[in-house]
Amino acid sequence: MLSFINSAELFSLILTLATVITGSIFFLDKYRWQPQREKETGVTDKEQTGWVAQARSMFPVLFAILIIRSFIIEPFQIPSGSMQPTLLPGDFIGVEKFAYGLHDPVFHKTLIPTGKPQRGDITVFIDPENPKIDLIKRIVGLPGDTIIYRDKTLYIKPACNGQKVCPAAYEVPKQFVGVTKFTELGTDLDEYKEHLGNVEHRILRDPNLPEMYSRYYQQPGSPVGEWVVPKGHYFAMGDNRDNSLDSRYWGFMPEQNLVGKATFIWISFTFNHNPDSSWPSWLPNGVRFNRIGAIH
């Protein structure tokens, strides 16, 4: 995977290397160089200066950052509108790294499994088509499920899992909320309240945009718009149903691609700059304090 390192993985690699290097210096100096130095010169650790002292002081900080970022919480920024209205461009979220397992920070191999994604979870994962980037979508289908998306309506036939009577397919419940203030390409969007598993959340649909059946991923042996989720994979969709490149188009998300579970928004910025403004477009021009909190 090193030939396809995304920005988050590259940072993890650099952070890991820096931690290993400064840690090696820390322990070499503490248990070998320092005793020899004090014996020969009488210079104590507190009086020591230079690059060795700097490396020793950096190690605890880098080690703490590595542990927190690799195994506890990692920050991510939402760059697009595919998860509107749940997540907006400019939201900065916290992702639980331990929700689905503890992974090594470089090769992303599972060290200790801790759980499985549940229907309705919002997950960050490595793009199956482009390992250089991470995606964020909502888990709709679990291994063994049959997912049907037809006429912009979602149906789920849960996996049988050895039951004597297998569950029947059902339409995922939703209620119309109204026309949203969010617009895509100048078109107002319909907003619905959807009940997916134990999660109640909002979705958007564009009433003027037809379904792109010709672009859907067609699973061998299944009709267009119908998918059977393989073992060890998941079916993920964006809440902005007509503006999301997701499992409907590229297929299934492998379990090993999971990065973590999105759980909260810790800050949210706006970047709505006037075209004539001299303010750099990459700098925020406002803060949405009402966005801070848990994600559903």
Task: Give residue spans per PLM region.
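Acidic/histidine-enriched ion/cofactor-binding microenvironments in catalytic or ligand-binding pockets
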Residues: 81
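Soluble "head" domains of membrane/secretory-pathway proteins
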Residues: 2-37, 46-47, 51, 85-296
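Transmembrane alpha-helices and immediately adjacent membrane-cytoplasm interface residues
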Residues: 49-77, 98, 102
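Transmembrane helix-loop junctions in multipass membrane proteins, especially transporters and channels
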Residues: 33-38, 74, 78
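Juxtamembrane inter-helical linkers in multi-pass membrane proteins
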Residues: 40-42
